Structure formats: structure tokens, C-alpha cells
């Protein structure tokens, strides 16, 4: 039985880069990993495969949307450290529903019997709006992970994600493993002062603190995980949080919880204390 992870977070904060490095850390510790990109941009797995791979929606179009004609080989690419990758894709901009495509991709995984093939399945999910389709991975996940930066908009999105996780936990097994603080800047960004307060308020913890570092940014442009980058004096500092997350997830019984989200208006009141 696979360990299923659902990684969410506000768009544009490095969620896919973080997801790819978590997958890499787990794979290098011996896990057979499948990473699934659930975003119409279909660039989640770019750091692992080094390219924009064919999406599920593109593969379905080729067979006139007859699911039964697709095999795993039609939609999965293998990349760094033997990580298998799948991209749900989405409809053309301005038409259709990206969430629906995610739901269909999850159903296709079931049809192909892929859930039992892997030690870890990681869903990297667009997380600004958790509608029915984009929330589908929570139906299967053991743990959700929220990626956030130390700013109000990111924390507001994280709180909405906590609401979705709490709602799903009523019917499904999913729990919140914690929050990954990304792009942590102690010089101009306040470190994690806001995230620390928020995590305590909703009953969770910071899993790791990923530094704001040029090397991580460069790895994304290079189409590589941090583990595949050339060795430099700062590389170990950048790898440390991803290794910490992987170590937490592969322990026998990771401590996780159902979050207790804050009301929207209460979040705005908290802002005054963060100025």
C-alpha cells in the first residue's frame, strides 16, 4: 500500500520545486516514487524529467477520450533517481475546468492499478482554490502538506487549505502533516515569525524551513532537482530541509493532525499583530 501525499499551497511560491525535491529525497532514500502534477501549467515534474512531458489530457485526446485504450506507458515518464512522473494537464486557457481534469486523472490511476505499484505517490496540486476536482487528491491522501511563505496572502491561502483538509477528514483518512516554510529570509522577510504563529493557531507545525537561496532558483530554471545540481559550498544547506521532510514521512507513524482553521475575519485581525 502506497504512502499518498497531497502537497498544496498558494500559486507561485515554489510549491512544485519543493514537491520535486521532496520526491527526490524520498527516492534517494530507497522509495519508489510517483509524482503527479495537478495544475494546467503542467510543469510540476519539470525539475525531475527536465522537460514538459505529455499530459493525461493530451494522451486522452489522442485516443478520443477512450480511457481503456491508455496504458501507464502512455502517460508516465521516468526521471531523476527513477522517479515516475505524470502530469494531469488541463483545458486551453479560458475554457473548461482544470479541476475536472485532475479528478479524471485520479480516476485513471485507479483504472490502471497504479496505486499499489509505488511506495510513495505525491500529488502536487494547484492550491489557491480547492474546488471539487482539485480537492480530489485529499480523498486518497494519508497526509497533506502545505507549502507557504512568511506573508499574509500565502497564510490566508494556507488557512483555506486547512478548511478543506478539515472538511475532507470527516469522511476520509487525510491529516495535515505540517507546513513547509519556503523561501525563508531572515534578513528582510522576518524569517518565519508569521508562519510560526499561524501554525500554532491551527494546531500544526513547521515541517522544515527552506532557505531563500539563489541555488534553488537556478535549479528550477535548469530543470533539475537540487540533488542533481553541481556540488557547491551552499548545496548541503539547501538540501537539509528536503531531507528532514523525507525523514519525517518515512518514519513508522508520522505525527499528524486535523487542523482547526481560523475564520477569515480572524485572520485579518491577526494581521495587526504582524506589522
From Swiss-Prot:
Pfam families: Fer4_NifH. Binds 1 [4Fe-4S] cluster per dimer. GO terms for biological process: light-independent bacteriochlorophyll biosynthetic process; photosynthesis, dark reaction. The keyword Cytoplasm does not apply. Its EC number is 1.3.7.7. It comes from the Bacteria. ATP binds at residues 12-17, 41, 182-183. Pathway: Porphyrin-containing compound metabolism; bacteriochlorophyll biosynthesis (light-independent). Component of the dark-operative protochlorophyllide reductase (DPOR) that uses Mg-ATP and reduced ferredoxin to reduce ring D of protochlorophyllide (Pchlide) to form chlorophyllide a (Chlide). This reaction is light-independent. The L component serves as a unique electron donor to the NB-component of the complex, and binds Mg-ATP. This is Light-independent protochlorophyllide reductase iron-sulfur ATP-binding protein. It comes from Pelodictyon phaeoclathratiforme (strain DSM 5477 / BU-1).
Amino acid at each position: 500500500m502506497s504512502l499518498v501525499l497531497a502537497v498544496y499551497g498558494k500559486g507561485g511560491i515554489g510549491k512544485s520545486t519543493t514537491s520535486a525535491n521532496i520526491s527526490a529525497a524520498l527516492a534517494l532514500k530507497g522509495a519508489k516514487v510517483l509524482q503527479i502534477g495537478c495544475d494546467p501549467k503542467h510543469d510540476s515534474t519539470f525539475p525531475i524529467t527536465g522537460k514538459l512531458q505529455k499530459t493525461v489530457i493530451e494522451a486522452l485526446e489522442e485516443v478520443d477520450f477512450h480511457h481503456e485504450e491508455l496504458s501507464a506507458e502512455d502517460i508516465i515518464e521516468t526521471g531523476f533517481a527513477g522517479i515516475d512522473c505524470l502530469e494531469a494537464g488541463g483545458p486551453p486557457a479560458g475554457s473548461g475546468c482544470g479541476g475536472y481534469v485532475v479528478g479524471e486523472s485520479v480516476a485513471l490511476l485507479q483504472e490502471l492499478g497504479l496505486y499499489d505499484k509505488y511506495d510513495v505517490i505525491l500529488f502536487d496540486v494547484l492550491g489557491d482554490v480547492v474546488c471539487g476536482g482539485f480537492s480530489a487528491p485529499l480523498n486518497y491522501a494519508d497526509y497533506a502538506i502545505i507549502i507557504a511563505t512568511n506573508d499574509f496572502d500565502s497564510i490566508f491561502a494556507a488557512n483555506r487549505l486547512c478548511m478543506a483538509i478539515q472538511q475532507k477528514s470527516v469522511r476520509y483518512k487525510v491529516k495535515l502533516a505540517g507546513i513547509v516554510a519556503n523561501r525563508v529570509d531572515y534578513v528582510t522577510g522576518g524569517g518565519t515569525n508569521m508562519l510560526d504563529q499561524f501554525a500554532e493557531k491551527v494546531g500544526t507545525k513547521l515541517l522544515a524551513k527552506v532557505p531563500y537561496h539563489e541555488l534553488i532558483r537556478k535549479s528550477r530554471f535548469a530543470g533539475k532537482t537540487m540533488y542533481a545540481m553541481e556540488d557547491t559550498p551552499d548545496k548541503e544547506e539547501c538540501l537539509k530541509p528536503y531531507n528532514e521532510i523525507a525523514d519525517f514521512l518515512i518514519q513508522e507513524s508520522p505525527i499528524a493532525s486535523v487542523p482547526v482553521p481560523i475564520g477569515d475575519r480572524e485572520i485579518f485581525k491577526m494581521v495587526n499583530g504582524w506589522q
